[in-house]
């Protein structure tokens, strides 16, 4: 991808540098940030711009305020946390557009940081509105996209805004995301193994169709496995099944086998009599799931099967948990897979909020080669799609 990066720009000194970041971080009921990985991930880009003598203007969204100004979606907690991480004052603008914001930007000195208020307080952001994008650019001189996680969205601060800058480039986080993706999917060291989990096949269908043509092995866990198992003729009790996708699931499975791709599905599970942390549970083979019970995690024999499938892997990509890991009774399968992936000798790439969360909860994140900050963006790249945010970076490349 012929993308220009921030360290390839001739000079940032004294320039107003607009950086699109993704500070869409989880908050508790008191508006305290509970996890700040996404803020930490862009520190190298922000620090590089500051060290180069730039005036740094940051823009982000938080939550889904749907075009309305709602205090609970203010960027204030992010400004506070960033200030602590940078060890310097980060001013929070009262808005993201308008005269007052413009005055604040014009008054900035090199080495100062201003965080704009939530860009999604305006409908124009999600509508990719050119007028809103122009107002948001605030006459800044250089645009940097370091928000991989929203680069699959054609939104004003990601796509339309680039038309109003003479210089457009990407940050270091974007560079990492693209580099690791290319290592895994375009120039992989084989065998290449994909692990897919999560509740539904429908959300991963296009990913699967793309992966069948690229990988050596596919491992399917989580709720989505039971649509495949039912399609193959198993009685899966009350387990989650997308009936309308049975035929497509069977076609995908058959296509993979025809292409010589090894396709792994659970052989046993942790079944429960209801969807509840207090449910009665038991380990059962797939053939013996009781009629009124549901499978909510992979079982120990499946963990062994999946772990053995990873033994000779040289590249592993993983998206989606193996069970309802938020409930302790159904978390063992996911955590066992975290351990198997973390302790493999392969290049390991994990993407998606739930999988990321599981890796952190297991305390194994340091052993994973790369944890992507993107959920939807990561999946769309796996699908082989061109992301709007990356496309405009390529068009404005070197």
Curated annotation (Swiss-Prot):
It holds the Pfam family PGK. It is found in: Cytoplasm. Transmembrane segments: none annotated. Its main location: cytoplasm. Pathway: Carbohydrate degradation; glycolysis; pyruvate from D-glyceraldehyde 3-phosphate: step 2/5. Keywords: ATP-binding, Cytoplasm, Glycolysis, Kinase, Nucleotide-binding, Transferase. The keyword Cell inner membrane does not apply. Its EC number is 2.7.2.3. One of its GO terms (cellular component) is cytosol. Substrate binds at residues 22-24, 38, 61-64, 120, 153. One of its GO terms (biological process) is gluconeogenesis. Gene3D superfamilies: Phosphoglycerate kinase, N-terminal domain. InterPro entries: Phosphoglycerate_kinase, Phosphoglycerate_kinase_CS, Phosphoglycerate_kinase_N, Phosphoglycerate_kinase_sf. ATP binds at residues 204, 326, 352-355. GO terms for molecular function: ADP binding; ATP binding; phosphoglycerate kinase activity. It catalyses: (2R)-3-phosphoglycerate + ATP = (2R)-3-phospho-glyceroyl phosphate + ADP. Belongs to the phosphoglycerate kinase family. Monomer. This is Phosphoglycerate kinase. The lineage of its organism: Bacteria, Pseudomonadati, Thermodesulfobacteriota, Desulfuromonadia, Geobacterales. The gene is pgk.
């Amino acid at each position: 991808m012929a993308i220009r990066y921030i360290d390839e720009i001739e000079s940032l000194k004294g320039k107003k540098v607009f950086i699109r970041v993704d500070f869409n971080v989880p908050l508790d009921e008191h508006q305290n940030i509970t996890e700040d990985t996404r803020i930490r991930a862009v520190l190298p880009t922000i620090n590089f711009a500051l060290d180069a003598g730039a005036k740094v203007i940051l823009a982000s969204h938080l939550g889904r305020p749907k075009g309305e100004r709602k205090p609970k979606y203010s960027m204030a907690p992010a400004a506070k946390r960033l200030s602590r991480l940078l060890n310097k004052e980060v001013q929070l603008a009262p808005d993201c557009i308008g005269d007052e914001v413009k005055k604040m930007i014009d008054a900035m000195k090199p080495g100062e940081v201003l965080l704009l208020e939530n860009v999604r307080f305006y409908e124009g952001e999600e509508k990719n509105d050119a007028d809103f994008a122009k107002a948001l650019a605030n006459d800044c001189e250089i645009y940097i996209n370091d928000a991989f996680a929203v680069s699959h969205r054609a939104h004003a601060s990601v796509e339309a805004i680039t038309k109003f800058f003479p210089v457009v480039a990407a940050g270091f986080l974007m560079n990492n995301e693209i580099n690791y993706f290319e290592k895994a999917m375009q120039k992989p060291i084989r065998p290449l193994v994909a692990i897919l989990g999560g509740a539904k096949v429908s959300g991963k269908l296009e990913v699967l169709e793309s992966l069948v043509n690229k990988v050596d092995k596919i491992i399917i866990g989580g709720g989505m496995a039971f649509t495949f198992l039912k399609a193959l003729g198993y009685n899966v009790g009350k387990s989650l099944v997308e009936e309308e996708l049975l035929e497509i699931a069977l076609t995908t499975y058959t296509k993979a086998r025809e292409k010589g791709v090894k396709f792994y599905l659970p052989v046993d599970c942790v079944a429960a009599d209801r969807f509840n942390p207090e449910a009665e549970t038991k380990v059962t083979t797939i053939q013996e799931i009781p009629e009124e019970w549901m499978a909510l995690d992979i079982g120990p024999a499946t963990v062994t099967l999946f772990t053995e499938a990873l033994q000779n892997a040289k590249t592993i990509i993983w998206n989606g948990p193996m069970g309802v890991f938020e409930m302790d009774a159904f978390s063992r399968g996911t955590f066992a897979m975290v351990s198997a992936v973390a302790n493999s000798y392969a290049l390991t790439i994990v993407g998606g909020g739930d999988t990321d969360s599981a890796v952190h909860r297991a305390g194994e994140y340091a052993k994973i080669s790369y944890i992507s900050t993107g959920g939807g963006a990561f999946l769309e790249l796996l699908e082989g799609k061109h992301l709007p945010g990356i496309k405009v970076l390529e068009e404005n490349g070197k």
